[in-house]
Amino acid sequence: MEKIASFTIDHIKLQPGVYVSRKDKVGESTITTFDLRMTSPNEEPVMNTAEMHTIEHLAATFLRNHKDYASKTIYFGPMGCRTGFYLLLAGDYESKDIVPLMIEMYEFIRDFKDEVPGASAKDCGNYLDMNLGMANYLAKRYLDNVLYHIDETRLVYPE
């Protein structure tokens, strides 16, 4: 079997950033998949499931209620390796196009202090696995270390 595209990225060189992972044609439409890499693969600890689960709930809620992106949001969810998230948007985008949206979204997560949306037994299959404090911290870290001063080296996969 051939490697899938995401396994051909050099994860030794990969740093936290906002990357286009792939673009898929569905009929006449394009769906862009973004790699929102929050930690350095194989260099630092991965995120725990509780904070990732909290970020997933907050980000999905934010995106699906966003005035410009609600109807374009296909999916937001965690990477199996726990170093980041995937965001799928309807449309043909480049990484730099969504940096303002990512800043807005991660500021929302950083500043969120209320009850996590969907964090109940009725709404979620694993509602007890949440950690809002760590989600706030990781969002702040991603903003401060990556998003607020992002450049081309964090927008295009390394060669």
Q: Where is each model-derived feature located?
A:
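Generic non-transmembrane alpha-helical segments
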Residues: 58, 62-67, 104, 108, ...
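Active/ligand-binding-proximal structured segments within catalytic/core domains
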Residues: 31-65, 75
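Non-catalytic terminal extensions that flank enzyme cores
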Residues: 1-42, 156-159
